[in-house]
């Protein structure tokens, strides 16, 4: 949408998955995964382009030969699959249209030689393996078979896409010498990393380039965006698996590694640094290192994240090639998350400042002229109330729970991961529950905690956390002593459609990851755009949200990134925080005693013994932040002003802005100039036809003209 709206020629590539990651169903609080079939249904938007199909090769062995000065390489006895493209057209706000090309994997044909030899199952297995590649998004990779399928998916995507890019370029220019001037290939995270050696393979094996010329072209063409600082997400593949599945690509990757090692040694004469920066080391292929080595640009997705990349994750690379490193803060599909999701708010903003903000998001800053207008603030709160009522009906229908639209809607919606610290939120909820049980008449602002998230199928602790949320919600929501003041809701099967109803209803946006662990986040931007006030740590894009709205319009708590590092160096001891905080100790004891007939020893044991993301260290400060949010909400005018300031400051987080920064600073491209539409001539005033026949003739004439 952003590329099309801004007028940049673009083609996105992905896989035509038959099913999404999974549909989430809680059974006795435990997440179970059901198939989420995308096809049929979604394919109504797809245009098949079988004539553009390409072949992708796996396994086999490599044979090399020389004919004079000509070097020939052939991959033999390989398993071949056909990548069939399907195009989806994405129109922007205006005349621009982007194309998303999705690849479906099919076996070229049944191996009749195997079939005729009676090896029916083996023949069918080959077809099944080919089709499995585009069967499901993110198959579980906690088994050798799962890892193999993931690697096949990644190579299938990059091989088909790079072949398509090269074909289209050669059709236009008949040479690859000008590839960097005409094409920008952007690697989004490490999943498409193999685009680098695959582009080298085509240039070396199919186009006859020498290594140095090919590498020069590749590294000027490819750019890389990193999306995480989590070590487990910086992909590493078993060298043995990589070599077995992709024999030719392994040879090229190995040569890249050898040459890059030599370059680093000549530059630094530091053997330790050579090993840290190596692409292949310790029996694994490091995809993030390959990305940085093979790209002309490396960027993070928030100002803090980009600094962390330079200071820690890729510090060795930064010390050698500092000019590679840039920042482009994430942006969101602005028009979806306000115009489509929140039509009431969109209409009211249009009434106040006009409609230019729909394509020029910084126009929202004009709303600040109304920050002291009590009538406008009251209108904003009335719209928020209507959106909360709309969401409350969804909760009643899906969960059977009545929630109070006048209570605080405290929202934490994101994937379930320990670093995102849903655990910290739960600890505070239990503390509030215990306080209300002990003091039923306490002055407590009614609050509804809303969770929505999915856990990776093989991530036990994340699933256990969901079960804990479900258990405590059952206890609280059925306790008549507190349920008029405190409610907890977990929304199953969180997706974009649910988010479009939930985000306009949120009062406070929980962005509470440990400082230094979240690359950026985009949920924080979507919630901010819809008037939610951020309650969070100085992590990811929260830093830039704070800059955009001012310290008075955001609630910040917790350790800062340098303080986290200092605490790690001194030695972090979770039990110290439990022993020195009676409220926290009571919460841990409450969980250890079991909740709703379930036990959560693994959850508390992790916190007490390790607490890898320092939830206990931030607990006391988090409680203060929650208490402050309640005080703010009680002052309706103050809360309304903070909400307006967040909406008005959200324009900087539009994807349109992010796309422009990528285009200017990384891709070095300019938008296409669309022909200006001619103004329609003023209609001539015509006398009304006296006879129906005259009307009919006129209508037929107009229809022919239109055709």
Identify the meaning behind each predicted range.
Residues 1-685:
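A conserved ligand/cofactor-binding region detector
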Residues 682, 687-702:
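Low-complexity, polybasic segments enriched for Lys interleaved with small residues
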């Amino acid at each position: 949408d952003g590329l099309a709206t801004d007028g940049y020629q673009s083609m996105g590539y992905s896989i035509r998955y038959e099913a999404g990651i999974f549909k989430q169903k809680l059974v006795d609080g435990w997440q179970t995964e059901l198939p989420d079939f995308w096809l049929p249904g979604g394919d109504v938007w797809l245009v098949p382009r079988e004539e553009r199909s390409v072949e992708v090769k796996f396994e086999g062995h490599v044979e090399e030969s020389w004919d004079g000065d000509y070097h020939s390489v052939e991959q033999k006895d390989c398993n071949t699959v056909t990548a069939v493209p399907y195009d989806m057209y994405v129109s922007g706000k205006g005349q621009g249209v982007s194309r998303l090309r999705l690849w479906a994997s099919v076996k070229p044909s049944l191996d009749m030689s195997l079939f005729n030899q009676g090896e029916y199952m083996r023949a069918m297995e080959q077809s099944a393996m080919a089709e499995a590649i585009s069967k499901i998004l993110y198959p579980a990779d906690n088994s050798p078979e799962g890892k193999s399928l993931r690697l096949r998916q990644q190579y299938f995507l990059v091989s088909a896409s790079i072949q398509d890019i090269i074909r289209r370029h050669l059709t236009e220019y008949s040479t690859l010498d000008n590839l960097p001037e005409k094409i920008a290939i952007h690697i989004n995270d490490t999943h498409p990393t193999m685009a680098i050696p695959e582009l080298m393979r085509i240039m070396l094996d199919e186009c006859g380039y020498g290594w140095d010329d090919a590498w020069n072209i590749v590294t000027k063409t490819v750019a890389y965006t990193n999306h995480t600082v989590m070590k487990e997400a910086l992909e590493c593949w078993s060298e043995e698996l990589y070599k077995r599945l992709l024999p030719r690509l392994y040879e090229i990757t190995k040569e890249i590694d050898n040459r890059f090692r030599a370059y680093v040694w000549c530059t630094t004469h530091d053997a330790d640094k050579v090993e840290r920066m190596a692409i292949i080391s310790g029996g694994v292929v490091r995809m993030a290192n390959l990305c940085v080595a093979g790209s002309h640009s490396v960027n993070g997705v928030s100002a803090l994240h980009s600094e962390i990349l330079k200071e820690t994750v890729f510090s060795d690379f930064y010390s050698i090639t500092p000019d590679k490193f840039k920042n482009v803060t994430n942006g969101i599909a602005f028009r979806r998350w306000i115009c489509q999701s929140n039509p009431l708010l969109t209409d009211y903003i249009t009434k106040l400042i006009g409609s230019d903000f729909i394509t020029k998001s910084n126009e929202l800053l004009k709303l600040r002229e109304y920050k002291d207008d009590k009538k406008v603030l009251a209108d904003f709160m009335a719209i928020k109330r209507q959106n909360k009522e709309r969401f409350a009906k969804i909760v009643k229908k899906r969960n059977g729970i009545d929630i109070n639209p006048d209570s605080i809607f405290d929202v934490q919606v994101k994937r379930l991961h320990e670093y995102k610290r849903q655990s910290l939120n739960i600890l505070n909820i239990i503390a509030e529950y215990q306080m209300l049980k002990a003091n039923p008449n306490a002055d407590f602002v009614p609050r509804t905690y809303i969770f929505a998230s999915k856990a990776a199928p093989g991530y036990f602790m994340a699933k256990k956390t969901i079960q804990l949320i479900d258990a405590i919600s059952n206890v609280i929501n059925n306790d008549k002593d507190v349920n008029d003041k405190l409610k907890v809701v977990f929304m199953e099967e969180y997706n974009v459609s649910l988010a479009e109803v939930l985000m306009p209803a949120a009062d406070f946006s929980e962005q509470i990851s440990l400082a230094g662990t979240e690359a950026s986040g985009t949920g924080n931007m979507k919630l901010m755009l819809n008037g939610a006030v951020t309650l969070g740590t100085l992590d990811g894009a929260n830093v830039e949200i704070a800059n955009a709205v001012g310290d008075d319009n955001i609630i910040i708590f917790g350790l800062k990134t340098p303080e986290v590092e200092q605490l790690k160096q001194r030695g972090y001891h979770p039990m110290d925080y439990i022993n020195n905080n009676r409220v926290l100790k009571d919460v841990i004891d409450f969980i250890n005693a079991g909740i709703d007939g379930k036990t959560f020893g693994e959850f508390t044991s992790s916190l007490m013994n390790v607490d890898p993301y320092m939830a206990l260290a931030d607990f006391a400060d988090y409680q203060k932040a929650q208490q402050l949010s309640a005080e703010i909400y009680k002052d309706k005018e103050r809360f309304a002003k903070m909400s307006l300031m967040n909406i008005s400051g959200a324009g900087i987080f539009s994807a349109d802005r992010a796309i422009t920064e990528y285009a200017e600073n990384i891709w070095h491209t300019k938008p296409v100039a669309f022909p200006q539409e001619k103004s329609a001539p003023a209609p001539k005033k015509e006398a009304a036809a006296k006879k129906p026949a005259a009307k009919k003739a006129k209508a037929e004439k107009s229809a022919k003209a239109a055709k």
